[in-house]
Amino acid sequence: MQKIMHISVLLSPVLWGLIFGVSSNSIQIGGLFPRGADQEYSAFRVGMVQFSTSEFRLTPHIDNLEVANSFAVTNAFCSQFSRGVYAIFGFYDKKSVNTITSFCGTLHVSFITPSFPTDGTHPFVIQMRPDLKGALLSLIEYYQWDKFAYLYDSDRGLSTLQAVLDSAAEKKWQVTAINVGNINNDKKDEMYRSLFQDLELKKERRVILDCERDKVNDIVDQVITIGKHVKGYHYIIANLGFTDGDLLKIQFGGANVSGFQIVDYDDSLVSKFIERWSTLEEKEYPGAHTTTIKYTSALTYYAVQVMTEAFRNLRKQRIEISRRGNAGDCLANPAVPWGQGVEIERALKQVQVEGLSGNIKFDQNGKRINYTINIMELKTNGPRKIGYWSEVDKMVVTLTELPSGNDTSGLENKTVVVTTILESPYVMMKKNHEMLEGNERYEGYCVDLAAEIAKHCGFKYKLTIAGDGKYGARDADTKIWNGMVGELVYGKADIAIAPLTITLVREEVIDFSKPFMSLGISIMIKKPQKSKPGVFSFLYPLAYEIWMCIVFAYIGVSVVLFLVSRFSPYEWHTEEFEDGRETQSSESTNEFGIFNSLWFSLGAFMRQGCDISPRSLSGRIVGGVWWFFTLIIISSYTANLAAFLTVERMVSPIESAEDLSKQTEIAYGTLDSGSTKEFFRRSKIAVFDKMWTYMRSAEPSVFVRTTAEGVARVRKSKGKYAYLLESTMNEYIEQRKPCDTMKVGGNLDSKGYGIATPKGSSLGTPVNLAVLKLSEQGVLDKLKNKWWYDKGECGAKDSGSKEKTSALSLSNVAGVFYILVGGLGLAMLVALIEFCYKSRAEAKRMKVAKNAQNINPSSSQNSQNFATYKEGYNVYGIESVKI
């Protein structure tokens, strides 16, 4: 039977006209459809077949037109009337409603319409659409709104707006009414964004959208674009097709969205219709072959049933209806009404049936009565009925326990979309990823973390990579979010597990879990070459100033020792010969001449002994304090010498952010879209503000699209570029080959990575609890060690330091050898000079002695012997210096 019905539906209205046009059982019905109402027309055709009877058939005459064009509507209506139609089904808008109602009242032609209800009394107009005013006012009172914006489409009439304004005046509501019906389609997106930005300035976060589906979708798109669909905003969609719009894109934003639904999909009658509706071929019936139907299409479908029931009732009452001879000119003056039109109007108003939109019944004015409208709210798991409104009961809330934001029911049967970003070591493609599918293609810290979170929360998930490869920032001009944050905000993903920094601007549009990793902004530079120790690196343990002070102290001590030795009588003594006899000379000697004082001080400083020592108390005091001084200096020097000689040092040109800000030779930048750039842009600290001023004006640009690009730029810059990034990533890259980058200085700030979910998502609390549990169990630390250090390619931090400090190279002590060789050479040179000097002096002495011998040969021998001994003693023994 269903197959036969399906085949019969495919018969075109033209064929019906040819077959039944001359039959007395054929009832001509007019149809005025606006262009683009494909689904409504398909529902009309299906109703024509579905509700046809053996007693008679409805034969349609269809015109497609612009309902906003009164001239086109007039021509079409008159054309239908002249064809002898019994009733007309059609649509109108604000511009054509008066034309149609005027013709209907004048010509007595009934007009059945699913368009918006009109105010006042219009005979011969049958309103299929229930009035929404009562339900809307009840919902406003239920939410206790006293201040809100009302966006209305003037093409739908102003009756609902007037009712709201009347109630506002009575109850002292503050209503901002804005007409969006006249917005230019070419600039509608820009104008919608501007409109909501103006509302934001007025703190208007409660908005009623009194528009049809297409305009609501356009507005919602721009609301999402500028991020006004998050927690803290509440929208009421004031039409009867809450589920008709594309709710998926706003479902996970966090904003409260409420509305009204006339088609109850839980009703068995609706379910049966949808089952048949979904089997129709869309090519033959545009808009069909779906599991949903627009409320205007549902009203159209049951308008056919209303007409069928009306004519059936007339047949039962044996009232003969005929247009033979009554097909006149609608523009005749005076107009000639159809005599039997009153009977048809009465029959239509008396119809009472159960349809897709509930109980269908009309009052004497052709308006719907005894109807029920479902009250809907949008939750993260889809639209949910919270109650209903009727003329008798008014608003009744049936959902006594609203689902909390922590409700995870339904997740078991849903695959959660996890957005992330390719960033080592958080998420990486496996080497053989081309041979794998799904989540198995990825590896990394966040991949393991996602598996742990899913295990604790009990849901299935699918990893997806952010389309633009960015973390998420809002464009300053368009206010559009990009990256992973954008995918959460615009409903493309359910959760983001990635190195996503928790920031204030992001927290305004998405929810974050507790941090799963703490970090801060750090500086990455190219690792400088290890500095080779200098020839005189043994001097490094003490500063240049200390060495100079030691030299001056050495000279000063030697001079003081020389002086006190000269002034102290206890430092002088007489010379003795080897046989113990006292010398015949009355002169006393002093061992501490200037050169011996220098020699004593040098020997004490070098921790070596000396053949002479002070005899006087004053001299010994000088020697004692000098020994104490040298003890401390030499001990300190020795303590530092090992470190300076054995450890290879790397001299970094930059040690902190202050160093970067004070120079321009080394460029520095951040990721072009991320929290690091936002930190510098918003910072009020002088150093960071100065760095931001440089970065935003630098040419070429110092910003990079990805972290990999930033690292490559550091490595290729030969030390002329520094990259500012999170410390965790900096530490990881430092452990990867070619091991040529390093982190310098401390962290510039303190922050954390968190798992992000859309505002108000049911995943928020379970994910947060899972992170805390993993932290307490030490799983997060194990994951970090696994991906940072266990898989490192540059060795553990400070590994091998003991081996490197245990051996010295020749370059470490080359200076000591140079001094030794220099000292030996100097000694040889001094010895040569002494030899030459002595030889020359001896030659002169021998010459003088020979001349003296010639003059006094008798006494020359003894004098010569004594002089020779005395002179030799003075030269090679203890010198005697007179002052």
UniProtKB/Swiss-Prot annotation:
PTM text: Phosphorylation at Tyr-876 is required for interaction with IQSEC1 and ARF6 activation, which in turn triggers AMPAR internalization for persistent synaptic depression. Palmitoylated. Depalmitoylated upon L-glutamate stimulation. ZDHHC3/GODZ specifically palmitoylates Cys-610, which leads to Golgi retention and decreased cell surface expression. In contrast, Cys-836 palmitoylation does not affect cell surface expression but regulates stimulation-dependent endocytosis.
Intramembrane segments per UniProt: 592-607, 608-610
Positions carrying Phosphoserine: S683, S717, S860, S863, S880
Signal peptide region: 1-24
Membrane-crossing residue ranges in chain numbering: 544-564, 617-637, 813-833
One GO MF term attached to the UniProt entry: kainate selective glutamate receptor activity
Covalent lipidation (S-palmitoyl cysteine), chain numbering: C610, C836
Cytoplasmic-side segments: 565-591, 611-616, 834-883
Annotated L-glutamate binding sites: P499, T501, R506, S675, T676, E726
InterPro entries: ANF_lig-bd_rcpt, Glu/Gly-bd, Iono_Glu_rcpt_met, Ionotropic_Glu_rcpt, Iontro_rcpt_C, Peripla_BP_I
Membrane topology: Multi-pass membrane protein
Region annotated Required for interaction with IQSEC1, chain positions: 867-877
Cellular component terms (Gene Ontology): AMPA glutamate receptor complex; plasma membrane; postsynaptic density membrane
Intervals, Extracellular compartment: 25-543, 638-812
Protein's cellular compartments: Cell membrane; Postsynaptic cell membrane; Postsynaptic density membrane
Disulphide connectivity of cysteines: C78-C330, C739-C794
Function of the protein: Ionotropic glutamate receptor that functions as a ligand-gated cation channel, gated by L-glutamate and glutamatergic agonists such as alpha-amino-3-hydroxy-5-methyl-4-isoxazolepropionic acid (AMPA), quisqualic acid, and kainic acid. L-glutamate acts as an excitatory neurotransmitter at many synapses in the central nervous system and plays an important role in fast excitatory synaptic transmission.
Assembly, per entry: Homotetramer or heterotetramer of pore-forming glutamate receptor subunits. Tetramers may be formed by the dimerization of dimers. May interact with MPP4. Forms a ternary complex with GRIP1 and CSPG4. Interacts with ATAD1 in an ATP-dependent manner. ATAD1-catalyzed ATP hydrolysis disrupts binding to ATAD1 and to GRIP1 and leads to AMPAR complex disassembly. Interacts with GRIP1 and GRIP2. Interacts with NSF via its C-terminus. Isoform 1, but not isoform 3, interacts with PICK1. Interacts with CACNG2. Interacts with GRIA1 and SYNDIG1.
Other comment: The postsynaptic actions of L-glutamate are mediated by a variety of receptors that are named according to their selective agonists. This receptor binds AMPA (quisqualate) > L-glutamate > kainate.
Protein name: Glutamate receptor 2
Species annotation: Pongo abelii
Lineage: Eukaryota, Metazoa, Chordata, Craniata, Vertebrata
Gene: GRIA2
